[in-house]
From Swiss-Prot:
Covalent carrier of the coenzyme of citrate lyase. The lineage of its organism: Bacteria, Pseudomonadati, Pseudomonadota, Betaproteobacteria, Burkholderiales. The keyword NAD does not apply. It holds the Pfam family ACP. Keywords: Cytoplasm, Phosphoprotein. Belongs to the CitD family. InterPro entries: CitD, Mal_deCO2ase/Cit_lyase_ACP. This is Citrate lyase acyl carrier protein. It comes from the Bacteria. HAMAP family: CitD. It is found in: Cytoplasm. Oligomer with a subunit composition of (alpha,beta,gamma)6. The keyword Cytoplasm applies. The modification O-(phosphoribosyl dephospho-coenzyme A)serine is found at residue 14. It comes from Albidiferax ferrireducens (strain ATCC BAA-621 / DSM 15236 / T118) (Rhodoferax ferrireducens).
Length: 98
């Protein structure tokens, strides 16, 4: 799946995150993470992001995550929302997202 337009999901409130997605370079997926808890949970946050984007089939784009201590479920929900807003009419295999 390729991100075709810019989209945003989330907030910068405590225990939430802001996800911005935009078209990127061809055949390249760039992920940028800024988090208040990067030292403690950075690897886990990255794993959740990679897993969610993988299940959605995202292979191209620029993803920026500004985390304020969000739980895994919020990270997944915000990523899914931003990506689905950015791809237009694409058939989603919902069972893969569980």
């Amino acid at each position: 799946m390729k991100i075709i337009k810019e989209a945003v999901a989330g907030t910068l409130e405590s225990s939430d995150l802001l996800v911005k997605v935009a078209p990127g370079l061809p055949d390249r997926l760039d992920i940028h993470i800024r988090s208040e808890v990067m030292r403690q949970f950075g690897a886990h946050i990255r794993a959740v992001i990679d897993d969610t984007l993988g299940k959605l089939g995202v292979t191209e784009g620029d993803v920026t995550v500004e985390d304020k201590g969000a739980l895994d479920c919020a990270i997944r929900a915000r990523l899914q929302t931003a990506v689905l807003r950015s791809v237009g009419d694409v058939k989603i295999e919902w069972e893969k997202l569980q």
